[in-house]
């Protein structure tokens, strides 16, 4: 009932937009994007759609290996992103998960501008910690909330806790740490996730807990957005539909 009222105030069904961004390459954005989208779908937050803004197309390659149709995949461009999100909202999608390229580019700025929440995966290393500043600056300038996720951490290593403390000086740190295990990469080979390969694994438990935390933050942010700006602009008639719809495609 409460969510129905909020959606009515916002002009229709809500589409939450979650973006993963990091200046540092190799932070685990693509792996985490796929895992969060799948877990969100499994947890009932769907239908979920994945959007790959990274020109490397790694997320598209992974999705094309999947047997499950959901989460869906939408092909778009930075220039079309805002309008396509409006179309996806009209088509009934509830969550969009966006993967972005490394380095600070116009693409990342555009994604942050339309995202409701930005997740910044960060490995617990000095070089990775130093690289978060540019992403933080972009989020602050856009007035968008961010969450750091300590990723690929060594279990019980001192540097893991030190990284969380250092990141907390710049923003909120998720209370769930993702640890380095081979099952994350192994599960991605054939288009799956650790939750689908071994639901009882520690890695699956971490992703499940992380999504639950992020979902709670998305809900709170959505409520604030509705009360701050109750009348959002609807999609324009005849808006562009992403090329190829939401079926499979061969990534170039």
Q: Where are the predicted features?
A:
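Extreme N-terminal, non-catalytic leader segments
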Residues: 1-19
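Walker A/P-loop phosphate-binding motif and the immediately C-terminal alpha-helix
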Residues: 14-55
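Nucleotide-state-sensitive switch-loop elements of NTP-binding domains
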Residues: 43, 49-94
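Switch II (G3) loop of P-loop NTPases
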Residues: 54, 88-108, 123
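Conserved Switch II/interswitch segment of TRAFAC-class P-loop GTPases
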Residues: 112-132, 154-156
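Conserved C-terminal guanine-recognition region of P-loop GTPase G domains, centered on the G4
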Residues: 129-151
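Beta-strand-loop-alpha "switch" segments that mediate conformational coupling across diverse proteins
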Residues: 154, 164-192
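C-terminal boundary of histidine-terminating zinc-finger modules
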Residues: 188-209
């Amino acid at each position: 009932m409460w969510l129905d009222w909020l959606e009515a105030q916002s002009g229709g069904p809500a589409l939450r937009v979650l973006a993963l961004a990091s200046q540092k390459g190799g932070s685990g954005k693509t792996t985490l994007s796929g895992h969060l989208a799948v877990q969100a779908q499994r947890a009932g937050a769907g239908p979920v759609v994945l959007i790959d803004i990274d020109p490397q197309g790694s997320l598209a390659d992974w999705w094309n290996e999947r047997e499950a149709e959901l989460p869906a995949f939408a092909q778009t461009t930075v220039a079309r992103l805002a309008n396509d999100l409006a179309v996806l909202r009209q088509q009934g999608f509830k969550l969009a998960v966006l993967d972005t390229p490394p380095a600070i580019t116009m693409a990342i700025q555009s994604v942050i501008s339309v995202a409701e929440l930005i997740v910044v995966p960060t490995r617990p290393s000095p070089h990775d910690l130093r690289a978060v500043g540019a992403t933080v600056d972009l989020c602050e300038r856009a007035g968008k909330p961010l969450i750091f996720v300590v990723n690929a951490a060594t279990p019980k290593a001192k540097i893991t806790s030190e990284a969380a403390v250092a990141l907390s000086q710049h923003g909120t740190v998720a209370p769930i740490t993702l640890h380095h295990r081979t099952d994350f990469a192994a599960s991605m080979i054939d288009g799956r996730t650790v939750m689908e390969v071994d639901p009882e694994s520690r890695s699956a438990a971490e992703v499940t807990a992380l999504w639950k935390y992020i979902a709670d933050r998305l809900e709170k942010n959505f409520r604030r957005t509705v009360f701050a700006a109750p009348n959002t602009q609807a999609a324009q008639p005849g808006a562009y539909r992403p090329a190829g719809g939401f079926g499979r495609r061969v990534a170039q």
